[in-house]
């Protein structure tokens, strides 16, 4: 009975550690995405480009840049992928720049999870 109890405690600790790793990866990806987008928007404004015209390009680059960060700790949860896919258009249509940034990170999450399956 003690062995089973120890095994269950280890299993719960492992699951908690994995959850913390996943959350830390997503938060880290958002921070990296914010830094990348700020840098790209700064370069664009320095060169005289209007930032709204470059938004799709910047968010695409951000989505590609966060894939390696998220690829390490992507869980295989179809419901999480479905909820993520459902929330991306809503976040992009919100009109708020930081929500668009989060949506691009979530898009990178979906890409990372599909790359992990293959």
UniProtKB/Swiss-Prot annotation:
Keywords (alphabetical) are: Cell membrane, Membrane, Transmembrane, Transmembrane helix
Question: Where does this protein chiefly localize?
Answer: membrane
Membrane topology designation: Multi-pass membrane protein
Naming one, the record's GO cellular component terms include: plasma membrane
* Residue intervals passing through the bilayer: 22-44, 54-71, 78-99
The lineage's top-level taxon is Archaea
Instruction: Please state where this protein is localized.
Output: Cell membrane
Protein name per UniProt: Uncharacterized protein AF_0836
Organism listed in the record: Archaeoglobus fulgidus (strain ATCC 49558 / DSM 4304 / JCM 9628 / NBRC 100126 / VC-16)
């Amino acid at each position: 009975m003690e062995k089973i109890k120890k095994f269950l405690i280890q299993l719960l600790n492992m699951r908690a550690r994995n959850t913390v790793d996943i959350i830390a990866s997503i938060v880290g990806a958002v921070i990296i995405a914010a830094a990348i987008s700020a840098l790209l928007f700064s370069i664009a404004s320095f060169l005289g480009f209007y930032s709204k015209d470059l938004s799709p390009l910047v968010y695409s680059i951000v989505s590609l840049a966060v894939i390696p960060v998220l690829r390490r700790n992507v869980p295989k949860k179809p419901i999480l992928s479905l909820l993520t896919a459902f929330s991306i258009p809503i976040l992009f249509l919100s009109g708020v720049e930081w929500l668009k940034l989060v949506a691009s990170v979530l898009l990178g999450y979906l890409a990372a999870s599909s790359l992990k399956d293959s």
